[in-house]
Structures are given as structure tokens and as C-alpha cells.
Amino acid sequence: MNEVPTTPVRLILGQAQQREQNSENCSQERNPRTFNSEPDSSFNSPGSSQFVIHPHEPLEKEKDEKQDLDRSIDYGRSSALNNKNNANPLENIDINKMFDDKKSDSGTNDDKGGASTSDKHVLALNYSPIRVEMNSSEKRSDKNVDVDENDKEGSHINKKLKLQLESVPDLKQSSTKDIINDKEEIMSSPMAIDMIETNISPNKFIINDGVERNDSFNINTDTLKLENDINEKQQEEDFIKSNSNNVVNIDNAYKEKEDEENDITNSHINRLTPLYETSARESNSNEEGRNDYDDDNQLDIRHDNFQIVAKRNEELTDQIYHLNQMLNSLISKNESLSFQYEKLNKNHQLLIDLTNEKLDKLNTERESDIAKVEKFKKRIKELNTEIKVLNSNQKILQEKFDASITEVNHIKGEHENTVNTLQQNEKILNDKNVELENMKAELKGNNDKLSEYETTLNDLNSRIVQLNDKIESTDIVLKSKENELDNLKLSLKETLSISKDFNDSDLIGQINELISTKNNLQQKMDDLNNLNDDNLKVVQDKLIKNEETLKLKEAEIDSLNSEMDELKKQITSKDDEFKMWQSKYETVEDEAKIRNAEVTELNGDIEDLKESKLHLEETITELENKVHKLENECELEKQKFEKTSLELESLQLKNSNIQAEHIKELENLHENLISLQNELKISSDRITTLTKENEVLMEQNNNNNNSVTLSNDQKDRDDEKIKSLGKQVQDWKEKYEAKEKDTNKRLKLLAEDLYIQYSSKHEQKVKLLKKGYENKYQNKFDQLNLENKTLSEEIEQLNKQLSSEREEKQELLKLLENEKK
């Protein structure tokens, strides 16, 4: 693939028809026994023409034709054919004829021996990707001198290869001037494409490009035919040399040779230079003229074959250029499709990533919303249980409060009874005071009336006993009231333990004050009881001692008066205590009313909580509906995503199919190029073999015809031309490698430009998609955020209420614990 073999030939347009006719006429004049081997010795292989041999003119005409000798051997000397070919040489070429192996031979010429190029054999050649020129240094040096002669006899065309990727060459040649101007154009060689390795690629096909190469060319058979032809030719030459003395045998041998040449020339398909023929019919008298004629005939044949090879080379270079152009277009299409596929793939992956991210976000938000809803449900359940507990506690507190009110009313009635009893006692005490005063008067007036005093003392004793009984009854009543107070205290503690949520600190303080006053009263009652006991003892002592002394009685009366004063003080203190109890009772009633108002407020709060519960349930249902809507939207988005993924898969399949087709086409083109290169190698090998054979034959001809000097000059020229062609081949190889490097650089730059364009377009698409999705879901997210904020605020309010209630309960529990201590 790196080195492309070339077939160096000279592009010739035109046939040397006139010189061929002149040479034939001259040979007929010099040798009356001329033969018609020239018109009949044509190559019958299709798609080729005969090599035109430039005849060597006689000595008397050499001076007139020296200007022709200075020119190159590939110069066309037929003006008629040059004019025909200069019009448009490519239009005169028929590819089907060139590759048709079954085409019959062209017809023979007239008896005079004039042969046209249409009657001559065509040489079939393999494809050559490069159009080259066998340049003549003499022709270039004499270019300005021979312009007029070229206009007369046919212009010499130097057409080189020009394979450019940018444009298709204009192969039509309008005039001889354009052909002359295009001589020095150097065209670039076709490029090798390094994208696909034929050894690695699994798909290898052969494109049927309209030419069946396997049918038209068989390399192995051609080589075998060439070897057989060379051997037969050598045998014939040996046979002719051995029989050169017999003239009759010469004529027969030459006729046999002519027939055999007509049969052999079919195998001379791929030879660029024919074998030199020696004539056995020459006699000793015309041997020199015969050799000159054979040399000229061979030169004409070579000239025609060079011309045909050049034409075929030109056609093949054009075909290879078109194939390279098609291959480059297919490569560019394939690259564009691959870039489009990469773009679609990247867009598809980005869409998948975006949708996955959005789905993940929606799923996380959905999970967070579900967790929040579950928390709200749990909170609502807790609030419901707390509300139920509060309702039950409220009922219990209400019942206990009613019971405590009834107990307070009962205590109030008992207190009124005690007040009445105290008033009666006061009245009794007043009466006693009056009686004591009377007794003092009686004692002072009548000391003799002891018996009366005794009776009065007895009465007093009886009264004291009654008073003691009354005091005992009052003590019993007080004890019962104390028990009732204890019961009330226990009931109050129970109420306080039950009503932990209420703020009863003032009530508890009042109760504590009542308890302290009660304890004081109990102490005082104990003191009174003790005093009563002492008084009883004293009275008994006095009763015992009254008999003895009146003084002691007076002292006792004084003590009784003092005791009466103390009792009055106690009564006044009890009145004060009663007033205090009455004021406390009023405060307790006020507090009870306040508690009732608080209970009503709590009932209102409970109703508000129930309403908030209903509102929360409604919001939960709305959130659940929104969650269902979001799930439905997610399902729709998933369906859309699946549709887009299916579409992308179909596009990927189409792209892969198209890419496979393009790869197949590229592989076919690569294989065609490889086949062309192989054919070029084979043709170059053939050229080398033929050149070697030519050298061998030229040596033989030089040994047989030492008198001919032009053949040696021609050989030297051929050697020089071969060397120049070798240099040109190396130049073409270097140009081919440079062109290949340039195309690779261009392809890399084009790929980078396409990648930059694709990346910019992709970023714009991603930005547009982001904006679209943000605008689509922004309103929904805002609504959900507002709802979440409202719900969080409501929950905070409920938490604050619960925390305040719990603090109140804890304070009540602390107070109860302090009271128990």
C-alpha cells in the first residue's frame, strides 16, 4: 500500500502512417520480392494497438529526413491520425473494446502494404494509477524549432497525472495548443487511505466496476504465453539462420513464419516491445536494405504500442482518479455519519443523564414528602391521643370540681352552725357574768347566805358540767370538721394530681394558708382543752376549798373572770378567723369561676385543634393527590423517555447499517486499489522482463546486423530513457507520500473542526433543555415549598402549645410533691 508501482510510458497521439508507407514503398523498390507480412502481422488481442516501427530510410533520403532522426522515437508522424486524435482522444477510446478478449482481428490492408492503425492489433494492459511520460531531451531542446512541424505532422502531447481532491480534471482536449500547454503540468499521485486495514476488516467484497478483470486478464496464463512465445521465437530464429543459404527454403520459411506470427501474436498481449524479426528471404545482394527495413518496421510497431500504452495509462489514471474521488467522498460521508452518530449518542447519553438526575431528584423529593406526610400522620395521631387524654382529664376535673364545690357548701353550713353555737356561748357567758356580779353582790351583802352560794355553786357546777359537755361536744364537732378538712385536703390533692395541666399555684397557696390556720386553731383548741381541764381541776379544788374559805372563792371568781376575758379574746379571735375564712371562701369561689373560664377556653382550644386536625388531614390528602399526580407525570416522562430511547436505538441501527455499508464500500475500494496496485506491480514486472528481452534481442540484432548503427543509438537512447523513467518513478513515489501526509493532516483538521462545532451545539442544547425543565417544574416546586412552610408553622405552633401544657403539668406535680413532703 505504501509504494505504488508505475508503468513508465510515453503518451503518444498519432500514427506514423506516412513513414510506414514510404518505408514499404522503398522496400518494394529495393527488393522486388517483398512480402505482405507487415499488414498481416498484427496483434489480435482486444484493447490494444500495434507498436509502430519507425523505418530506416535509404541513404539517399537520410539527409532529407535528419530532422526526424533528431526527434524522439515516440513522436507521431501521421498528420491525419494526429488531427483525428487531437480533436478529443478520449472520445475515440472504447473501454469495452479494449477489454473484450473475444474480439476478432482487424482486416488486412490492400496489396500495396499500407496499414492503418485501426487494422492493427490492440495490446491489453492492466490498470495503471499513474500517467507518466517518457520525456525526450532532444524534443524539449528543440521544442521551439519544431512547433511548425508539429502543427503540420501532429503535435507531441505531454500529459501528466493530476489527481487532486478538490476538483475533477477536465480531460477533454479541445485543441493542439491546449495539449502543448499541458505538457509540463505535474499532477499529484493518488493517495493511499489508511482508515481501514484490509487484513483486519471482516467484510471484504469486490465491486463490479463494469470490467471483468478475472475474465480479461489472467496473469499466470500471460506469463506462460510470454515464455512460450520467446522460446518459439528463438527456435524460429535459429532455424532461419541455419537455412539462410537456401533461397527457396527462405521463401517457404518466411511464409511459415508469417503464419506462425499470426497465431503467436495473441499471446503477446502484455508486451510493450515486440520481438525483433529476422528475414530469411534476404539474399546476399539486398541484405543491408532488408535489415534497415526490419529495424524501421520494429520501430513503428514499438511506436504504436507506446502510443496505445500511453492512452491506456491515461484512461486508467482517470479511472483511478475518479475512484479516489469516490473513495474520498465516501470517507467524508462516513466521517460525517460517524460524527453525527457520536453527536446523537452524546445527546442521548446527556438526555438519559438529565432524566435520571431529574428522576432521582423527584424520587428523593417524593420520599422526603412521604416521610413528612408520615411524620404529620404520626403527629396527628399523637395530637388525637393527647386531645382524648385532655378531654378525659377535663371530665375528671369537672367532676372533682363539682364534688369539691358541694363539700365547700357543706363546710360552709357547718361553719354557720359553729358560729351560732359560739354566739349562744357568748350569750351564756354574758349571763354568767351577770350572775357572777350578782353573786359578788350577794357575797358582799350576805355572808350568811352560804347555803345559797353553795346552791349557786352547785348550779354553777352543774352549769360548768354542762359547759364542759358543750365543750366536749364542740371538740367532737371540731374533730369531725378536722376529719372533714383532712378529707377535703385529700380530695384537693387528688384534684391537683388529676388537674396537672391547670395553673393552680394560687389555689394551692390558699389551701396551704387554710391548712396553717387550721393547725393554729387546733393548737388553740388544744390549749383551750387543756385550760378547760385545768379549770375543772381548779373548780373542783375551789369547790373543795369554798367550804373552807371565801377568799379562795373570790380568788376563783377572779380567775373565772380572767378566764372569761380570755374566752372573750378567743371569741374575738375566732370571729376574726371566721372573717378570714369567709374572705378565703370568696377568693376560692372567684378562683373556681376563673377555672371554669379556663376550662371553657380549653374546650375552645380543643375545638380549634380538632379543626386544625381536619385541616391537616385535608392538606395530607391534597399532598397525597399531588404525589399521585407527580407519580403519573413521572410515568409519562418515563414513557416519553422510553419512546426517545427506542427512536435513538432505531437511529443507531440505521446509522450502524449505513456505516457498515460505507465500510463495505471502503473495503471494496481498498481491495480494488490493492488489485490495481498488484496489477501495476505485475505490469512493472512485465516491463522489466520485456526490457530484458528487448536488450537480449537487441544484442542478437546487433550481432546479426553490425552494419546498422541506428539500432545501437536507439538502444542507448532507450537506456537513457529507462534511467530517466526510473528517476520519475521515484519522484512520483515521493509526491505520493507527501500527498498522503497532506490528506491525513487535512482529515485531522476537519475532524477537529467538526468536534468543536458539535461541542458548541451540544452545550446550547443542554442549556435550552435545562431552562425548559426549570420553567416546567418551578411552579410546582414553589407551591410545594409554600405548603411545607405552612405545615411546618402549624406544627411549630402545636409543639409550642404542647410544651407549655407539659411545663404546667410539671409545675403542678412539683407543687404536689412539695405538699406531700
UniProtKB/Swiss-Prot annotation:
Highest taxon listed in the record's lineage: Eukaryota
GO BP field: cell division; centromere clustering; chromosome segregation; meiotic cell cycle; mitotic spindle organization; nuclear migration; positive regulation of exit from mitosis; protein localization to chromosome, centromeric region
Regions of compositional bias (Basic and acidic residues) in chain numbering: 99-122, 136-153
Post-translational events: Cleaved by ESP1 at the onset of anaphase. Phosphorylated by CDC5/Polo-like kinase at the onset of anaphase. Phosphorylation takes places at proximity to cleavage sites and is required for an efficient cleavage by ESP1. Phosphorylated also by CDC28.
Keywords, sorted A to Z: Cell cycle, Cell division, Centromere, Chromosome, Chromosome partition, Coiled coil, Cytoplasm, Cytoskeleton, Kinetochore, Meiosis, Microtubule, Mitosis, Phosphoprotein
Chief location category: nucleus
Location(s) in or outside the cell: Chromosome, Centromere; Chromosome, Centromere, Kinetochore; Cytoplasm, Cytoskeleton, Microtubule organizing center, Spindle pole body
Chain segments annotated as coiled-coil in the UniProt record: 310-821
Phosphothreonine modifications at: 7, 273
Cellular-component GO terms for this entry: cytoplasm; kinetochore; microtubule; spindle; spindle midzone; spindle pole body
Feature type site, description Cleavage: 77-78
Positions of the UniProt region annotated as Disordered: 1-52, 99-153, 274-298, 699-720
Function: Has a role in spindle assembly and stability. Required to ensure a timely exit form mitosis. Essential to maintain pre-anaphase spindle polarity. Associates to the plus ends of the microtubules at the kinetochore and spindle midzone. A component of the FEAR (CDC14 Early Anaphase Release) network which promotes CDC14 release from the nucleolus during early anaphase. Required for proper chromosome segregation during meiosis I where it prevents premature sister chromatid separation.
Protein name, per record: Kinetochore protein SLK19
Organism taxonomic ancestry: Eukaryota, Fungi, Dikarya, Ascomycota, Saccharomycotina
